[in-house]
Amino acid sequence: GLQPGHHHPLPAAGAEVLEGGVTRVMKEFKLRVFRYDPEKDAQHHYQTWTVDYREGMTVLEALLWVFEKKDPSLAFRYSCREAICGSCAMYISGRYALACKVQVKDALEGDTVTVSPLPHMRVIKDLVVDQTKFWENYARVKPWLINDDPAPERERLQSPEDRARYN
């Protein structure tokens, strides 16, 4: 038992506190991934790997671990790894998410993380979907600033007055 003045230490990330204060640290987990190769498969299936867990590991890092250590045929997209570009958008354990942002510990269902491609999009291979319609709509919407004036030779600086208007 604890002596007066002593406290239970906080469990490490990836640790689970069981009954009686016993701590179990996660060393590995199962990654269940949607697989489909139109050149080989009549229909999709799921494949599961046991992955070595590391504190703070993201789902993207788990996919890269599988690609590098277990199966270099696994297909998925990623780019910035900073939750900005959206390239690694997937359906992770029942929710839409960016694989580079979601930590494994937050996506676990029991001891398993399930990863599927975005629904309602044609699957090219595994987790890679056809984004043609998305990019067509993106270009149609033009989600960028359109300038009526020619570009200046120097950058445009925001005045303190302009800045104050936006605060």
Give residue spans per PLM region.
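Low-complexity/repetitive intrinsically disordered segments
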Residues: G1-L2
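Charged/polar low-complexity intrinsically disordered segments
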Residues: E16-E19
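Signature of N-terminal electron-transfer/Fe-S-associated modules in redox systems
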Residues: G5-L10, G21-N167
